[in-house]
Amino acid sequence: MKKRLTQILSRAGLSMSALTLTFTFVVSGTKATQPLRYKTTGQDSSQSKQVSALVAEGAAAIEHGDTATAKTLFERALSIDKDNVEAHSYLGVIADRAGNLLEAERHFAAAAIADPLSPSARNNHGAILLKLGRTRQAATQFETSLRLDKNQPSALINLAQIRFAGNTPEDLRAALDLFKRAQSIAPDFEVARSLVVTALRLGQRDEAANYYRDYATRVSGAQGEMVTPAARAELGAALLEAKLTEEAVKELSAAVASDQKNVEAIVNLAKAYRAANDIDSAGRLLETAVANGLDDALIYAALADLYESIGRAENAIPAMRLAVERDPKNEGYRFRYALLLIDTKAPQAAIIRLKEALPLFPDSARLWFALGIAQYGFQQTNEAAQSFTRAVEIDPKAAPALAYLGMINAEQGRFPEAIALYERAIATNGQFAAAHYLLADVLVKLSAIDVPRAETHLKRALELDPTLTQARLALGKLYLRDEHLAEAAVEFEAAIKADPNLAEAYYQLGRTYARMKRTAEAQTTLATFKRLSDTQKEQSETERREMLRRLANVRF
């Protein structure tokens, strides 16, 4: 009967959203009944038969769990034939299972020396070397094994995992090729999963999606040991990160179905549903988790995000409060709770909560920043300036705080100071679209308007954020001022397309059409402006809040 040696367990991991490969390093088994390859110098046929019998008896003892007897039998075989490959291999496995890696390596090395042309002996030696952390030597053994026999799934998988752990593009491409070769020889759901993982790590989204389909088919039909719920949750999170939403939903759903208390998997599945625009499923999932007794801060925080996204602030605020209560040392939750209160026109409540939080986090730049926003919203301008200044003292790269200080100075007519602050914000974060817009807004208020510079910053703002309607409107007004009527019309029309209720855009576009002698269009556009003008005050407040939100959402 053909028997495989017990697998040597060793695990190789990779770092991508805590994602790991799930299979172990494997050892190629020797067969108790195959012709033995060992030196026979000075050994007669009776000794050879005795050695074969001892090895076969030892293998049977291992099958019955009698390791002590098996070890004695294999050692007796080696006392007769010190180069017996199978005896060394079995003793290597026994030593490995006992945690004696050095003894295991000695036996596997002896087997490889005794039969240097044996692919399985090379593979076994490589596996134990890897377990000892001798990666380079292990790779050499696997490469030699594959030169002797290129169609060994175990050696291909082992070498692929080493290349994968190298984590360079070249190593990852090599790993992908090795996994593909192994899969073509012996299709397996764990190798299929590894192909998905490797493609994700290489940023090959389309290939990862294709590999995932094969993996999903194989894992659904696999018998016996399956991928663990934790491993499925890890893969689902990586798929979500790669924006493979459909695949993420499928994998995370399987993880949650197998482990309904895995909070992180539940939260990620809710995110995947939201990414798929399935808000109802996300809400049901999170609310059901709470109803089932998962009283966890992560769940409440995810619920708060969901409620906020659909305009249910009355539900978002208590959910975020519960997240803070369950995890009071989470600075991020305190910050988000404060912003929720500010966004729902409750700055005074935010001030109270932030003053409770700051003694716990006295050096938190973003909590000082949030306090400044709340104070600014509560018209405590001096106090807000002090809070923003404190945020910048803690974190000189706090671009949003610099921008707010610029706004305060601009409102008080200190334009040079405002310009300097906006420039600092941009120098700190060149991708800060709102700061480019705010700087341009001040530049056009100077007695000597710097039109080219303002235009440059407005265009940059729109490159960074095409949805920044205020910048588009301001750019159109610059064009109109300089009689670039066609360009102005384009910007105003784009602003109206982005926000059909933007009254000022209709007014400016009507003026532009009039100058272009497009009288009928001018009259229609100005009529729309008059209809919307009654809501102008409310609209201005909405625009102001939108700008404040953009500033608050920029990460430190």
What does each model-found stretch correspond to?
Residues 80, 114, 148, 184-185, ...:
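Structural marker of alpha-solenoid helical repeat scaffolds
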Residues 51, 85-86, 119-120, 153-154, ...:
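Helix-start (N-cap) detector for alpha-helical repeat units in TPR-like alpha-solenoids
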Residues 90, 124, 158, 194-195, ...:
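Canonical tetratricopeptide repeat
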Residues 49-80, 97, 234-241:
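Alpha-helical segment of the N-proximal tetratricopeptide repeat
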Residues 34-42, 194, 214, 226-229, ...:
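Terminal, low-structured helical/coil segments at or just beyond the last alpha-helical repeat
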Residues 2-9, 13-47, 157, 193-197, ...:
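Long, contiguous interaction/recruitment modules in multidomain scaffold/adaptor proteins
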Residues 63-73, 97-110, 132-144, 166-181, ...:
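Structural signature of tandem alpha-helical TPR/SEL1-like repeats
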